[in-house]
Regions:
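Phosphate/pyrophosphate-binding loop motifs in nucleotide- or prenyl diphosphate-using proteins
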Residues: 1-127
Length: 127
């Protein structure tokens, strides 16, 4: 696995544990990050990946490889959790916002994986 994918998955794991801890403890969800990017950076990259990564938006395709396919599945699952959270009437805005950002973060990780797996130097991206 590319290092960016390993590190990103570790960050996603922490993100999920922080949501769980906030739900159980009643405390606020702490600021979360992905590969050193805060929520605003994740938003910027997810909205304009060409500007920040030199990579346009992607549509999941078998040609992108199994890592991106699995990340897309994970992103779909994150969206399902977000929808279910609303449908069951949960009202914690911080958790809902975190779940929403999670799917964006996974999309950014998909983009980073495409960049890394194409042999481009991920350390040179404009973040």
């Amino acid at each position: 696995l590319p290092a960016v994918l390993r590190n990103g998955l570790s960050d996603i794991n922490v993100w999920l544990w922080q949501i769980l801890q906030a739900e159980v403890s009643g405390e606020a969800v702490p600021a979360q990050s992905l590969c050193g990017m805060n929520a605003e950076a994740i938003r910027l990259v997810s909205h304009d990946p060409m500007k920040y990564l030199g990579q346009g938006h992607i549509v999941p395709d078998v040609a992108l490889g199994p890592n991106v396919a699995l990340l897309n599945w994970l992103r779909a699952q994150a969206r399902e959790v977000e929808v279910a959270y609303v449908q069951v009437g949960m009202e914690r805005e911080d958790i809902l916002a975190s779940l929403n950002r999670l799917s964006s973060a996974i999309y950014v990780l998909m983009l980073l994986t495409v960049v890394a797996e194409s042999g481009r130097d991920i350390s040179k991206v404009g973040l």
